[in-house]
Amino acid sequence: GLTDDEIIRGIAAYQPVGSRARVVRTARYTVIDDCYNANPDSTAAALRSMATLPAGRRVAVLGNMGELGANAAALHRETGVCAAKAGVSLVITCGELARQIAAGAAAENPAVATASFDTLDALLPALPGLLQPGDCVLVKASHSMQFERIVQALTQA
């Protein structure tokens, strides 16, 4: 077996696999790369986790969540409410359903700023103008949204 010290060192050295709750600190931002997949529960958990990180402004870049059936719009809206309750200052969305996330956040707390984009190609060039140095940025959506492109842009900025 392992000693207690070996177990502690192993836990301390843990790095998530792929784009699953991976925290990347750059000169400009703290990026939470959780873009491998998304559903309402995992997104709510990611938003709550972001609230525990020491950082400046909290920004959530959120996209469509797939396979939610007839309740998809309502579940996206509830995710926006969760973002507002988690202390997110800015909600940036991409995709038609994700607009409901922005609507839910603004309805819960009108002080939450929102920006919504139809496509990733529209969002990417606008992103630098929306973010500020020191921001903590959560990036989360269903894998089909290709949000790894956002993570790449943020971590190479």
Report each predicted region and the residues it spans.
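ATP-dependent carboxylate-amine ligase
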Residues: 1-157
